[in-house]
Amino acid sequence: ANCSLDAYHAFQLAQAIAPARIGFFEEPIAENDARLLADLRRRLPIQLAGGQNEGLAHRFRDLLVHQAVDVLQPNVTIGGGFTQAVRVAGMASAFNSPIANGGGWPCHNMHLHGGVENGGLVEYHHPAVVVCQQLFNGLTEPVDGWLTLPETPGLGFDLDRDAVAE
């Protein structure tokens, strides 16, 4: 929901979509308000996820301490790179919480999820993938819904300098 709802409307929408048995309801409350998310989480039959739009470790800590989400969503392109995302994954692990990628950039984030014990789903967000396809060579393509980590050095893809020059 991209942090777009107040608590009342988030609850109403969650109740309406619960029969669809979705995996989780992503960032329903404005500004990822940990207190309001925790209250919402206690009242819902579906899991909540959050953090894809967060960039600071203490914001993830607050989501965990308040038990505001079931699934934490660090993103290496938004939240301070791989070092910060690994720290957040470690915090989540200490709270027995899985992580999932939200906010796209799967070719970057799949490496985080493949490298931590609580890594999980990686969102194949089409607009972000299209941007990556225009800027990089050697990107991994999904096969039957799965991305395979490359065995080449680094992230497994290279910057297309000609595309950047254009």
Question: Where is each model-derived feature located?
Answer:
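Extended hydrophobic packing segments that form well-structured cores
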Residues: 155-166
